[in-house]
Amino acid sequence: MRIVFDIGGSVLVPENPDIDFIKEIAYQLTKVSEDHEVAVVVGGGKLARKYIEVAEKFNSSETFKDFIGIQITRANAMLLIAALREKAYPVVVEDFWEAWKAVQLKKIPVMGGTHPGHTTDAVAALLAEFLKADLLVVITNVDGVYTADPKKDPTAKKIKKMKPEELLEIVGKGIEKAGSSSVIDPLAAKIIARSGIKTIVIGKEDAKDLFRVIKGDHNGTTIEP
């Protein structure tokens, strides 16, 4: 299979870089890449939001703040490249053609953000569509898609299986600003819906056994037509 992994910055760098998790996810990705083609997109997380909050004090535009976030995602991507060592494509990939070339070289391309207005969720969904991937795996700080934000609504229930259209109903009303964070952002949900790509949303614990996840054995949410 060809698989794109979308790793949230809040998972990789919650407050500071989670060295143990970075080592573990690098090991898991390396093992999966022995039998499958793998590409990765890394988010900015809290660090990106901290920088964006400071930029707001200077009345920076949303586009300018997006550029700040993109730089942080690429710094996070470099940490994962360091952990993947020789298995990774040696530089942060900045466009889909380069990612495709890296996959052909049997390397793992690691991307951050690309363009203002696109979250890394959207980048991952677009990359999966571009590469004609068989599977998109979203690793986030919430262990699946819920009927509402479980951090704000105690009655929220996890959805084990859903169609892309149902995902759009849940997340499609959001307005994305620089540094916005949701389990999957509206643009990514639209791309997932139009491409029909099978998507799995999991939390940090499930990410410790990616072979099990890609076989469908996980505690998260599966999204497919």
From Swiss-Prot:
Lineage summary: Archaea, Methanobacteriati, Methanobacteriota, Thermococci, Thermococcales
Protein name per UniProt: Uridylate kinase
Keyword entries, A-Z: ATP-binding, Cytoplasm, Kinase, Magnesium, Metal-binding, Nucleotide-binding, Pyrimidine biosynthesis, Transferase
Superkingdom assignment: Archaea
Keyword DNA damage appears in the UniProt entry: no
Binding, Mg(2+) 1: 6, 120-121
Coiled-coil intervals, chain numbering: none
Organism the protein comes from: Pyrococcus furiosus (strain ATCC 43587 / DSM 3638 / JCM 8422 / Vc1)
Classification via NCBIfam families: pyrH_arch
Regulation: Inhibited by UTP.
Pfam families reported for this sequence: AA_kinase
The protein's role, per its UniProt record: Catalyzes the reversible phosphorylation of UMP to UDP, with ATP as the most efficient phosphate donor.
Pathway in which the depicted protein is active: Pyrimidine metabolism; CTP biosynthesis via de novo pathway; UDP from UMP (UMPK route): step 1/1
Residues binding Mg(2+) 2, per UniProt: 121, 182
Enzyme Commission number, as recorded: 2.7.4.22
Gene behind this protein: pyrH
Catalytic activity entry: UMP + ATP = UDP + ADP
Residues at which UMP binds: 44, 66, 114-120, 179
Subunit annotation: Homohexamer; trimer of dimers.
Locations listed in the record: Cytoplasm
UniProt-recorded Gene Ontology molecular function terms: ATP binding; metal ion binding; UMP kinase activity
Family according to the record: Belongs to the UMP kinase family.
CC terms in the record's Gene Ontology section: cytoplasm
Gene Ontology BP annotations: 'de novo' CTP biosynthetic process; UDP biosynthetic process
